[in-house]
């Protein structure tokens, strides 16, 4: 991948991850998630599940890999629910 393109993609993913992390942090502060929840790590996991699930679903031409990846990621976030 061209370095300029890589940096642009990196910025895109960082912004997306930051938005997810901010939302998860608000959930933690508001008592929706336990205090030991790590919003940054959870955001990384959600984004990885989304992107990985999307890639697998596209290559398989089947939505099931996306469903499985997101179900697992969301279940992990829910495991921190109060």
Regions found by a protein language model. Give the residues of each.
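Hydrophobic alpha-helical segments that form the core
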Residues: 37-56, 72-76
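Short amphipathic alpha-helical segments at helix-loop
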Residues: 1-8, 34, 54, 58
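Short secondary-structure transition hinges
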Residues: 1-21
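C-terminal peripheral helix-coil segments that are non-catalytic and often amphipathic
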Residues: 14-32, 49, 60-82
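Residue-level recognition of alpha-helical structural elements
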Residues: 5, 35, 39, 62-66
């Amino acid at each position: 991948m061209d370095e300029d393109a890589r940096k642009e993609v990196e910025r895109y993913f960082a912004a997306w991850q930051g938005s997810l992390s901010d939302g998860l942090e608000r959930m933690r502060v508001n008592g929706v998630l336990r205090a030991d929840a790590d919003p940054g790590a959870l955001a990384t996991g959600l984004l990885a599940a989304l992107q990985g699930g999307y890639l697998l679903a596209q290559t398989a031409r089947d939505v099931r890999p996306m469903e499985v990846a997101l179900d697992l990621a969301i279940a992990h976030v829910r495991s921190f629910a109060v």
